[in-house]
Amino acid sequence: MKVLAVTGYKPFELGIFQNDHPGVTYIKKALHRKFLAFLEEGLEWVMISGQLGVELWAAEVVFDLQLEYPDLKLAVFTPFLAQEENWKEENKEWYEFILEQADHVDSITKRRYESPEQFRLKNQFFIDKSDALLAVYDEEKPGSPKYIVEVAKKKEEIENYHSYFILFSDLQDIIEEEQWNDAE
């Protein structure tokens, strides 16, 4: 696997409203573990669309890993131009920081937001251009990742494509490990 599309919940879907929320640490640890395993399998590129939450946290994990794995690259393909224009200032700054550090940045539709169709096009693009999908997603709590997961499942039925998930139970395991380690 050379190209991994990464997505997941937006912060509000997880009840997270600040980047220093403890849940962010556990999500980033889970992403880090998955990325390490995929690096052993030849991972070269991580693709995100730049949405707030899991995708930008994944970008931060990639940047951390690049210190040890300099060949690992981050691509940000936004669904449309200026997706951040209605975000809070601190989120805009965080997003701009990610874009500045990314190895490749482009917009899929190359125009400003016009319709939800641009999100459908983004989902299709991500699945078409990647070898696998990693989603922080649990089918018991559908949310914004549901649509790209459905596209990935359709591709899995006809091609050699794989979807990997970080479930809430995986995050709970990490929390318990951390608590166990802190108790020792």
UniProtKB/Swiss-Prot annotation:
InterPro entries: YspA (IPR010697). Gene3D superfamilies: 3.40.50.450. SUPFAM superfamilies: MCP/YpsA-like. Pfam families: YpsA. Belongs to the UPF0398 family. NCBIfam families: PRK13660.1. This is UPF0398 protein Bcer98_1280. It comes from Bacillus cytotoxicus (strain DSM 22905 / CIP 110041 / 391-98 / NVH 391-98).
